[in-house]
Design a protein with these regions (language model features):
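Bacterial N-terminal signal peptides
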Residues: 1-6
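Extracellular glycan-targeting catalytic surfaces
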Residues: 11-236, 242-249, 301, 343, ...
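CBM-like, beta-strand-rich accessory domains located in the C-terminal region of large
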Residues: 11-12, 16, 454-646
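Terminal accessory carbohydrate-recognition/targeting modules of carbohydrate-active enzymes
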Residues: 14-55, 406-409, 413-457, 462-468, ...
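Carbohydrate-active enzyme catalytic cores, enriched for enzymes
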Residues: 249, 284, 291-446, 627-628
Length: 646
């Protein structure tokens, strides 16, 4: 099995000097200087805590009740075909469907979303329900195995063994749902990997409660076929590959397969290569969605837990030192209200710090915040490996202007403004037509931000959210960036940044400069075409009420002859201007930001309602020159409110 992955020397395109020395104020090194730790399990201490501490006793009562309710109520079925977790979206607006454990068509006749109380249960949505159910079911197996280990309840061990037998006996009866994709229990190998981690943990927890011959059958009928599937795919640097290598490594630890362990770590696309080649010099995952920092961190954390309990965490020392920074790096990007920028295609706007995440990983990546948060939590982690008392609280790092050239991003901060500039991409995966996009905050108030995307299964994902019109970018004939490209950082200073995309589209060069000047934020955008006059323009989006001058007329012809994404705007009006338009954006609370857009000659300005984070919408502008031209420069100036708290 190990030999299914070819081994080769990894390269390191992103220099990462001294990972262990980064963010020192948030790390708690031990006597050997390691800021990561090997997880422990104290079962005797756990039994004492649930016996002597009333709060822990109550927690145990609730945990047993939840597991028992699930155990007597639910059984997976071979005839249930799995779907894609991203398919669980409303056909109305792409908002997430609400999952619960009621069986579709048997116990409930509709699904629902925040915007739609009755969503038809189609085969595709039923398959979405199955994939979530199956993941929950496997998680319940782990919880039941822990309860058995804690209390000695043999009925729980019998149930877990029975479930493992069910999956092993029937594994090959689940046919892969996509040609060329070997996942069986789930729709994709990513979900196969993240749940294989749970299966592995359930068997580990059973320990001697599962006879050797039964473990051998599980290995032969289930674990080895899963390993073969995971090792046959994702031969690349990718977030999914991280999960697959980490899952296989945990199977290797469970069954003592050292060759498999070595290959999962040291293979050409093993874990070491994934982190060396997939994490930028700014300690951001190269696919750029900031959510992938935590996603990759969780994969490494799952392996680190297993390795620590097996006495082998030290073999992962350099990788753990690097992964620790994935937790901390987003702190330097946060806006004053704690929100994070949203480059690429994350499904929601993140926050930093994320206390729940810091608490979740404290057993391997302790931080003052993580220990403090974990100290408030009662769960299996804090029962088995109680968090140490946190040291004195640490202040979050001050966000300052910063060039993140390794990640193709920059931050400007000054005079009440904070800007996040995303000028290029490093990989095709998860990229959007958003090169040269920027987000702007005035103090704690978002003026313009990237909403991310909806579930990948929604037509709005590729049809709107991934397209240029959804971003603050230059447009040519209504189209933005084609493909993906690193772009060129042409200059950076604490109060100004400039970058270009020489091949923004075939025959098109685009460039943008952002500057903090005399209290204002000034955006200068240039477009040049090599193939003659084109319709040149740009899009701008706002989180407040746009107060435009004069009378606009309804633009019934708005989407005619334009790319698909234009059809998602509603209530569109239009007016023609010459050289400049001035208006205000009302952010609420008496804060109104004056905005002026300058353009060469006559232009049309459309205003409309566009999709925001579902189910919300926002006010958006599209500017386009009346006459086609071969080049144009647009200057947008945002001035500070006359009297506003920062």
């Amino acid at each position: 099995v190990a030999g299914l992955i070819a081994t080769a020397a990894a390269t390191t395109p992103y220099p990462k000097p001294a990972p262990a020395a980064q963010f020192p104020e948030f790390k708690l090194p031990d006597r050997q200087g390691n800021a990561w730790r090997a997880a422990r399990e104290d079962w005797e201490g756990a039994r004492r805590r649930v016996r002597e501490d009333p709060d822990w006793a109550e927690w145990l009562r609730r945990e047993r009740a939840e597991v028992e309710r699930w155990r007597v109520r639910h059984q997976d079925r071979v005839e249930w075909l799995p779907g894609w977790s991203h398919d669980g979206v409303s056909p109305k607006d792409g908002s997430r469907l609400v999952w619960n454990d009621r069986i579709p068509r048997e116990e409930v006749q509709f699904f629902s979303s925040p915007s739609d109380p009755e969503v038809e249960i189609t085969p595709k949505l039923h398959a979405w329900w199955v994939v979530t159910f199956r993941g929950q079911h496997v998680e319940m197996m782990v919880r039941a195995a822990r309860l058995h280990r804690l209390t000695g309840d043999e009925a729980l061990a019998d149930w877990v063994r029975g479930q493992l037998d069910f999956y092993a006996d029937n594994f090959l009866r689940w046919e892969p749902q996509r040609p060329g994709h070997p996942a069986r229990l789930f729709w994709q190998t990513l979900t196969e990997a993240s749940n294989l981690v749970k299966f592995t943990e359930a068997v580990r927890l059973l320990g001697p409660a599962s006879p050797p011959e039964q473990r051998a059958a599980w290995l032969r009928q289930f674990f080895l076929p899963e390993v073969r599937a995971l090792n046959s795919t994702q031969q690349a640097i990718h977030n999914i590959a991280v999960w697959q290598r980490c899952a296989v490594a945990q199977v290797a630890l469970l069954f003592g397969d050292n060759d498999l362990w070595r290959e999962a770590l040291d293979g050409r696309f093993g874990l070491r290569a994934q982190l060396a080649e997939g994490v930028t010099g700014d300690f951001l995952w190269q696919e750029q969605s900031l959510g992938y920092n935590s996603f990759v961190l969780r994969a490494v954390h799952s392996l680190a837990l297993a390795a620590g309990l097996s006495g082998r965490a030290g073999e992962l020392g350099p990788e753990l030192a690097l992964a620790h920074n994935l937790l901390l790096a987003p702190l330097v990007l946060r806006f004053p209200n704690g929100e994070l920028p949203n480059p690429a295609d994350s499904g929601r706007i993140g926050r930093a710090p994320a206390p729940d995440l810091f608490a979740e990983v404290y057993r391997v990546f302790p931080t003052p915040l993580g220990l403090e948060e974990a100290g408030r939590v009662r769960d299996w982690n804090t029962l088995l490996d109680p968090p140490a008392l946190p040291p004195a609280a640490v202040r979050l790092p001050e966000v300052a202007s910063r060039s993140l050239e390794s990640s193709r991003m920059a931050v400007l901060r000054g005079g009440g403004w904070q800007v996040f500039f995303h000028y290029g991409q490093l990989t095709r995966t998860h990229s959007q037509a958003e090169a040269l996009n920027y987000s702007v905050y005035w103090g704690e108030r978002p003026l313009s931000r990237d909403p991310g995307t909806v579930g990948y299964g929604s037509p709005l994902h590729r049809g709107y959210y991934a397209r240029a019109l959804n971003h603050n970018v230059p447009l040519v004939d209504g189209e933005g960036q084609q493909g993906h490209a690193r772009g060129e950082l042409t200059s950076f200073a604490p109060d100004a940044v400039a970058a270009a995309q020489p091949a923004y589209r075939p025959g098109v060069r685009a460039a943008r400069a952002l500057a903090l000047r005399d209290g204002a934020l000034v955006d200068t955008t240039e477009i040049a075409t090599a193939e003659g006059p084109r319709r040149l323009g740009l899009a701008l989006h706002f989180q407040g009420r746009v107060r435009l001058p004069g009378s606009f007329r309804a633009a019934g012809e708005w989407a005619v002859g334009r790319p698909e994404e234009f059809g998602y705007w509603t209530e569109v009006t239009v007016r023609e201007f010459t050289s400049e338009v001035r208006f205000e954006v009302d952010l609420g609370g008496g804060v109104r930001v004056p905005v002026a857009i300058g353009a060469p000659g006559r232009f049309r300005l459309w205003q409309g309602s566009s999709p925001d984070v579902p189910p919300r919408r926002r006010e958006s502008l599209y500017l386009e020159l009346v006459e086609p031209v071969a080049s144009a420069t647009f200057v947008t100036a945002f001035r500070p409110p006359a009297a506003a708290a920062r």
